[in-house]
Swiss-Prot record:
The keyword Transmembrane helix applies. This is Biofilm architecture maintenance protein MbaA. The gene is mbaA. It comes from Vibrio cholerae serotype O1 (strain ATCC 39315 / El Tor Inaba N16961). It is found in: Cell inner membrane. Coiled coil: none annotated. Residues 1-23 form the signal peptide.
Length: 791
């Protein structure tokens, strides 16, 4: 027999004996009576509340009408020459309050405002002789008049003490004491009356307390009525709404339910016992058995339930549960793998790595070494963008495979335990645990990790221009928790990048100080205190003879209040990497243009000024527009200015519209640090520049390798392209003479002059002229060099 048939035959006699329908009928009847009685009570209270409100409204209106129609105010405005009119007005206002006061405890206030809504006089029926108009009421009157623009208005609000009040104002003409025909602040005044709604407030609080629900005040009636909701119109367009808390009526209904349940509980108990006795054997026991098996599955005490072969609902239910748990187990294993592992590389993800690492660190032993390695694939974004995401993904998979295989090899050869993970993008982490006897295990592991990239082995990793930088942190010296170890390993990794990439760096306190200083520099740059802490220095450069001053190179100096002196070698790369150098470039250009007139006044001739441009700004036409505006503002001729760009970025000048725009506007362009990059002869010929500046290290290298004669053909090539040549870093007479013999056009270096502030240039010029007194008179001039001068 089917289970549903068997249950029907077993429970039908019990249902007939219970006769539960009678209890439902009784409950419904009592519920309706309770709701009707409660509704009547609430309606009576809300109407009583409205009655108090209307009484107060009548009181306020009577005060306002009495004042408007009485001679009190008329005498005040008509007897302007009476010196006692103000005292009489105040006395009359207080007398009016006492005459019309219906209740000594009820606070009533009378005020007169001028046309500018400023308080003239105030009186109230309190015992405080220094009472003043409540500022919240004053603000409300102004807001109410501004929003309604009515000549007369009565409305409800609360004062600063949180008391319910009813406020009425009437705008009257000072001459007619009636409603003005037009609004002129000089000819009108306001009569303001407000009364504290004590009875209204007491009743409202009692209703709210009894019903555990606030009374809402609104300017529109409720759109529909639900439950015991009550509403009453206090005045035209102003309603009070009460929606009692359902739990109050529900509590009373629950009380009725409990009484009914108690009365029918005894009779139902016998019925339940009979049902349980019958159902236990035929229904409950099989279900309990199934439930126990399901619980064991949930507690991982068994993999699945036993399938029942009975031909009934419980048998089919057990079969379906069996199939469902089989599918759930399979899905759980797949989901667990996705949640704990990176879907692309199949390595652990960041979350799983931290969970496993925390567990491992909590169980570490003194006989073990533990390292955390942070690995970043250098240039991966470039490869991913240039060759496509498919190539990028394959590189990540290849690197992950290499990491996984290396971990297995070390487990076999060095008895290590490792956890490898892909943290994000091109960043990986490895936690390596080795026995105490292997002190250099992390170093060997890192070297083998880099081997396919460094040695260009026959591996997918060697087919593309990517490298890897590795930072290593040691437990517990560099951190006792995985978060700290990862952070410090990341810091070491960035040090490896800064040292040239494709290498390994260990975390240390000194390294942390370097990183901390870099962060401090970045934070200080973001504050933008350029005018307070930045200043310009000017280093002169001369013709090849060293007799004629040609111009000055603008150099940026930073004296930070917090960091002390910060060299350009420190803060310029940080500014470029963080995108802040655009602001610094603009500050330098603006400051140099501002000071150029002073500079020329000092040297008494038009002078050339060279300004370095950040490589990060070379693709911005907006900078050219800024330069043009600054030049117009400070009266700077483009012919006075040279902009210097580094050789490494000048090689791609065709892609930098800024250079072509500056050249079009008439500014000079110079390739700075020539010799530090890899410029071909073709590129040198094609450069849209007028000057070449040889790098100091390039010149030092030629001297150190005894290849000084290499400089002559380079200078001749530049001259053949109508380019001037500047040599920087001249620090000795020998170096000066070498370059002068090869007809280098301009010289710059400590041999001729140090970087100076604007105020130091004039004394320096005077000292330089004094030293050069052995030359012919007036040799010190400011013209372009002739070729004969260098011979």
């Amino acid at each position: 027999m089917k289970l549903n048939h068997r249950i029907l035959l077993l429970i039908a006699p019990v249902i007939l004996l219970s006769a539960a329908a009678s209890s439902y009928i009784i409950y419904t009847s009592q519920k309706n009576a309770l709701l009707k009685r409660t509704d009547s009570y609430l309606q009576l209270n809300i109407e009583k509340l409205a009655s108090h409100y209307r009484q107060a409204q009548s009181l306020v209106s009577s005060y306002a009408f009495t004042l408007a129609k009485s001679d009190i105010i008329r005498h005040y405005f008509s007897l302007e020459k009476n010196p006692y009119r103000e005292l009489e007005l105040v006395d009359n206002l207080r007398e009016t309050l006492q005459i019309l006061q219906p209740n000594e405890k009820q606070l009533v206030s009378l005020s007169i405002l001028n046309g500018h809504e400023e308080l003239l006089y105030y009186a109230e029926n309190s015992s405080d002789p220094f009472a003043e108009l409540d500022p919240k009421v004053m603000a409300y009157i102004k807001q109410r008049f501004a929003s309604t623009q009515k000549n007369s208005d009565i409305s409800y609000t609360v004062n600063s003490a949180g008391e319910d009040i009813l406020v009425r104002y009437d705008m009257l003409d000072t001459q007619t004491l009636s409603t003005p025909l037009s609004y002129n602040r000089q000819d009108v005044f306001f009569v303001v009356v407000y009364v504290v709604l004590e009875q209204f407030s007491q009743l409202r609080k009692k209703i709210e307390f009894d019903n555990q629900s606030p009374i809402f005040f609104t300017h529109s009636p409720p759109s529909y009525r639900t439950g015991l909701l009550q509403s009453v119109e206090l005045q035209p367009g102003f309603y009070a709404i009460l929606d009692p808390a359902p739990k109050l009526i529900n509590a009373q209904l629950h009380s009725i339910q409990r009484e009914l349940l108690l009365s029918f509980g005894v009779s139902a108990l016998v019925t339940v016992l009979m049902l349980l006795l019958l159902l236990y054997r035929h229904v409950i026991n099989p279900i309990l058995h199934l439930d126990k098996q399901l619980e064991e599955v949930e507690n991982n005490q068994r993999k699945n339930i036993e399938k029942l072969n009975t031909d009934d609902e419980i048998g089919r239910l057990s079969s379906r549960f069996y199939a469902m748990y089989s599918e759930l187990h399979s899905t759980y294993q797949r989901t667990k793998a996705l949640a704990e592992n990176d879907h692309l590389t199949k390595l652990a993800n960041r979350y799983q790595f931290q969970v496993q690492a925390d567990l491992l660190l909590s169980r570490c032993y003194d006989t073990q070494h533990i390292w955390v390695m942070y690995i970043d694939l250098d240039n991966f974004k470039y490869v991913n963008d240039k060759y496509g995401h498919q190539i990028g993904d394959s590189l990540l998979v290849s690197f992950a495979t290499h990491v996984r295989q290396l971990c297995k090899n070390f487990e076999a050869s060095h008895n290590t335990y490792s956890i490898a993970a892909r943290l994000s993008g091109d960043e990986f982490a490895i936690l390596l645990v080795s026995p105490k006897r292997f002190n250099d295990c992390a170093k060997i592991f890192a070297q083998r990790l880099l081997a396919p990239i460094q040695n260009k082995d026959n591996s997918p990793l060697s087919h593309f221009p990517i490298t890897a930088s590795i930072g290593i942190a040691t437990f517990p010296k560099d951190g006792e928790h995985i978060e700290k170890l990862l952070l410090n390993a990341d810091t070491a990794m960035y040090q490896a990048k800064n040292a040239g990439k494709n290498q390994v760096a260990y975390y240390s306190q000194a390294l942390d100080q370097i990183v901390q200083r870099r962060n401090n520099i970045e934070r200080a740059l973001r504050l933008g205190l350029f005018d307070q802490e930045f200043n310009l220095a000017y280093q002169p450069y001369f013709t090849c003879s060293g007799k004629r001053l040609v111009g000055f190179e603008v150099l940026l100096r930073w004296q930070s209040e917090l960091l002390g002196e910060v060299s350009p070698e420190e803060f310029i790369p940080i500014a470029e990497q963080t995108g802040l150098f655009g602001t610094i470039d603009r500050w330098v250009i603006s400051k140099a243009f501002q000071e150029i007139s002073t500079l020329q006044a000092i040297v008494k001739e038009p002078i050339q000024v060279s300004i370095n441009l950040s490589s990060a700004e070379l693709n911005s036409l907006k900078l050219a527009q800024f330069i043009h505006r600054q030049a117009e503002q400070f009266g700077v001729s483009p012919a006075w200015i040279d902009f210097e760009i580094t050789e490494t970025f000048a090689a791609d000048s065709q892609s930098f519209p800024l250079l072509h725009e500056l050249s079009r506007l008439g500014y000079g362009l110079t390739i700075d640090d020539f010799g530090s990059g890899y410029t071909s002869i073709t590129q040198l010929v094609q450069y849209p520049v007028q000057k070449i500046k040889f790098d100091r290290h390039f010149l030092d290298t030629l001297i150190a390798t005894n290849k000084q004669n290499v400089i002559r053909p380079l200078i001749d090539l530049c001259h053949s392209q109508s380019m001037k040549v500047t040599a920087e870093g001249i620090e000795s007479e020998t170096m000066h003479q070498w370059l002068a013999d090869y007809e280098c056009d301009y010289m710059q270096g400590f041999y001729f002059g140090y970087p100076m502030s604007l105020s130091e240039i004039s004394p320096w010029l005077h000292a330089s002229n004094h030293k050069k007194k052995s030359y012919a008179q007036d040799h010190y001039c400011f013209t372009e060099p002739s070729q004969s001068e260098c011979r």
